[in-house]
Structures are given as C-alpha cells and as structure tokens.
C-alpha cells in the first residue's frame, strides 16, 4: 500500500505544530504572562537590589545611598527616565543603550552632562524591560510602607532564610501567622 505524500506531510506538520504548542505551554516561564513577575525579574537581573535592596527602601550599596522607592514621588514616566538615563552626579547607572549619545537624557547629551554623567550599567535593558520594572515598582514597592514578611516571601520565595527577620512582624491580616519567637 502506497502512502499518500500529502497526508504524510500534513500529519508531519500537525505533529510539529502540536509539539511547538506544547513546548510553548510548558516551557514558557510564568513571568511571560504576568507583568508583575516580568518586572520583578528585571529588578533582580538588573541588580536594582544592589542599591535599592529587595524592598526598595534603598539606603546604600556600591553606588552610594540609593533613594527609597517606597517613598518616591516619581511618576511612571520619571521612573522610566531614571532607569533609562541614570542620575547625573550619582552612582545610579543608565540602563538604556545610547543614553546621552544617540538619545538625550534630561535634555542633555554626553558633552552637556560632562563629568556628571552616570555610570553605564553592566547590562542594558530593552524598552519593554524598563517599562516592566517601572510598573513593578509602582505596583509592589511605591507607597507600601515598611517591608513585611509576606512581601519578602513574595520576592524570595518561602525557602529563603532572608525573610526570617520579618517573621515576628507578620500578622494574620498579611496572610501569615505571627511567630511567637519561642523555639522548641
């Protein structure tokens, strides 16, 4: 019995399509469909935690005393500009390729900003990454008050000992039972 070449090709294409769809469904990181997770991943990858800390309170790092993102009054656009262009005269690096060269920042080019030019980040971010990290800061850090156990677990996961310091601060309202501090 001879095989129908058209049916074989169609069956092969169907199998390949199903394999690609299943690979996308199972291989896709959950962050791709969750904007907050994308922003958090960028916050970690770009090492924002190096100066602003995981909770966004800032307070210092290798670049100096970083501003608190929890108390900032910056708008989304201003956060995006700060991430893109850094902060002249500070240790806050710029994350946009071409900042001060092909793109003016704060209405200045490299010559105009002079020796106050911010450092270049170790890695450049795409515009969509810059938007995602700004959205993450606005949704999960800005205006949130003091950091707590639930926020720490949301950032690091429940296997990190980093969050142990916040256990005594946890309240049932935050969805986490408070620790008594007693050990057995």
Q: Predicted segments — roles?
A:
Residues 40, 80, 84, 131-138:
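Non-transmembrane alpha-helical segments in soluble domains
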Residues 60-66:
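Short cysteine/histidine-rich zinc-coordinating motifs and their immediately flanking basic loops
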Residues 28-34, 45-46, 54, 93-184:
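Flexible coil segments in periplasmic/lumen-exposed cytochrome c-class electron-transfer proteins
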Residues 10-21:
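Bacterial N-terminal signal peptides
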Residues 50:
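Short, cysteine/histidine-rich loop/knuckle motifs that typically chelate Zn2+
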Residues 67-69, 91:
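Conserved beta-strand positions that form and line the central face of beta-propeller blades
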Residues 21-27:
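Sec/Tat signal peptide C-region and signal peptidase I cleavage site
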Residues 1-7:
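N-terminal secretory signal peptides that target proteins for export/translocation
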